[in-house]
Amino acid sequence: MRTRFHAAVGSLLVATILISPLALADMTVNVGGRIQVDAAFFDDDVTNLNSGTEFRRARLFAEGDIDENWGYKLQLEFATGDELIADGFISYRLTGGKLLLGQSKVPFSLEEVTSSKYITFMERSAAVNTFVPARRVGAIWYKTAGKMHYGAGIFGQNSNLDVDGDEGLGIGGRVAYAPILHDDNVLHFGVNASLQEPTDTDAETVRFRARPTAHVTGTRLIDTGVITNVNDTTYLGLEGAYVNGPFSAQAEWIGTRVDRAASAGGDLAFDGYYAFVSWFLTGESRPYKGATFGRVTPKNKRGAWEIAARYQAIDLTDGNITGGEQETITLGVNFYVNKYLRFMFNYSSVEVTGGVNGDEEPSAFMLRAAIDFK
């Protein structure tokens, strides 16, 4: 059933539209989308991971301005076979920033707030995919002021989830600072924090699990299972990035603390991290703005080539929960035909300790064709 939180946010959005001084002649509409097609081939160890293909993302969006202060965005995801809302919000421009009312990304993690159109590897790291709240319904505010960036929000669950019982609320924030800020030379640091309540059910549960890098497989080799009697969950994150011409380095650590009843085994702590380096063989540089990375534009008509390497690890074992540990090394090659069309190749070697099916060491070859338009 739809929760009181969703109803309150929905009422606020409707009220906002009704009371805004709408002038239809001033409204603008921009339409765009993205298509990402993946293939993955696994060298299995213990678990059959099922090689295959998929539409990783297939999205259409409409966005624009209602007047000089108010704007909107609606983005739908079709890759799952059902139409899902990726983003759906009304925005209000504040001095140097924006307030978003609806479903949007929670301000947490450099890799998460960087669009999938611009991330260096086919998939974000396991720590980011497992712990970061991603898109939620709520009120999100962000502001960039010189070398500083701020983001904060209060939110419930994703609008595409059916929730029985009262939806757990969450708060979160991100602060980033770029002491070096030039077109092709950037040094970035950031801190993230979030506190989230579980949905108000009899069990009050959370669960953490991670794929072996590739999204094509639905199999998770590490999994805490359902953790019950949870009071709340705290997430902390540290992030850093450096760009100097064609060279780039980026790293994050995310820690999670589960506040749990003593009768269920007490509190739990899990964490994960990643670090990667990349190099543009053709001389391009990763563009940075508003504490996130953006679109790469090749310098010439022959396109741009980028090579990258990443190490990541995640630990889902603590106390009486044996979810397992996973370490992954990924090598990547990206070919940017132009600023809208990109081909990606990733090879990942995975090592799992104490996972769902014990210890194992699978690997994966992954390919992606990605295009976006607007």
Per-region residue spans from a language model:
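Extreme N-terminus of proteins, especially the signal/transit-peptide cleavage junction
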Residues: 23-28, 359-361
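Outer membrane beta-barrel
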Residues: 26-199, 270-299, 306-319, 324
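Outer-membrane beta-barrel pore domains
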Residues: 45-48, 92, 103, 193, ...
